[in-house]
Amino acid sequence: MTSTRLPQNIGEACQQANNLGVNAPELARFQDEPPQMASGDVGKSGYLRLGFARRGDRSILAQMKRRVPYLVQRALYWDEALPQMPCVFMISTSGCILQGDRLALDIHVAPEAFGHVTTQSATKIHSMENNYAAQVQTIQIEQGGYLEMMPDPVIPHSGSRFITDTQITIHPTATLIYSEIIMSGRKYHLADQGFKFDVYSSRITATDFDGKILFTERYVLEPKKQSLNSVGVMGPFHVFGNVILLTPQLHHDRILARMAPQYDAETGIASGTSRLPHQCGLIFKVLGKETYQVKAGIRLFWRIAREEILGVTLPEPFIWR
């Protein structure tokens, strides 16, 4: 087995995104092309490549390639606890994900480099009449590297179809904090409130540099076929948060000791932390009735992970985020 590698060029990355949903059983009903513009056409085949590297006492955004609708401006150093870490906002010039969109994101973290990647706002997946949207993400973190991938929530609108595949290759001395938040549509908009999307399909796979699979998490959500509000799925909750922490084993027990499981039906919050296979890391899941509850749960796990792994805490959040 060979290790997951970064695509060599924009064309290869975009082709991976174009191929992603073609043979997916959950998308078999949605292979029709949009009449306005073909899937993956100009403006609908986004690409972003970010490369973080160490330069002296700090890290920099050493490489950036892009194709619309993706956009990144200069890296900022806003984290006072980690002033050596470049922080990058991913921006979409389209403002949302539309039917027929094919998106590819590649991130490379060089040895001993740091990086933080987030989005400028929530990612909205608009309603669709034809086809679907697909996203491929490839993340590679070399020896001693550290990456925080902390995007804002995803909001799948009524009738949307989305498939995403994330391939992670990580050195055993490196650390990745990978977060995702999925909301139940536009909660306070009558036409879109609740789980009314058609398909949300996700796969995340991590391997080492020898190609050994560390773990795979796969889920296909089809609320029109099976209610997500049933017991054992979302129950009474409306927002789902998921954080994957890949880090050396010596940190695991200390983090687990500080992350007590929680369930409070009155306030509407539930969370817990588990070990991933092959001693590669931990996974934290949190359910809430409101987005701020899930964000607070993720922020707690993020802060504890930082303190135990790096010996630094998390600064107070910006008042505008």
Curated annotation (Swiss-Prot):
Q: Which InterPro entries match?
A: UreD
One Gene Ontology term, aspect cellular component:
cytoplasm
Q: Does the keyword Transferase apply?
A: no
Q: What's the chief localization of this chain?
A: cytoplasm
- What are the coiled-coil residue ranges? none
Residue ranges annotated as transmembrane are: none
Keyword entries, A-Z? Chaperone, Cytoplasm, Nickel insertion
According to the UniProt entry, its GO molecular function terms are:
nickel cation binding
Pfam families, alphabetically? UreD
Kindly list the places in or outside the cell where this protein is found, as annotated in its UniProt entry: Cytoplasm
PANTHER family noted in UniProt: UREASE ACCESSORY PROTEIN D (PTHR33643:SF1)
Q: Which family does it belong to?
A: Belongs to the UreD family.
Reported function: Required for maturation of urease via the functional incorporation of the urease nickel metallocenter.
Quaternary structure per UniProt? UreD, UreF and UreG form a complex that acts as a GTP-hydrolysis-dependent molecular chaperone, activating the urease apoprotein by helping to assemble the nickel containing metallocenter of UreC. The UreE protein probably delivers the nickel.
Which protein are we looking at? Urease accessory protein UreD
Q: What species is given as this protein's source? A: Photorhabdus laumondii subsp. laumondii (strain DSM 15139 / CIP 105565 / TT01) (Photorhabdus luminescens subsp. laumondii)
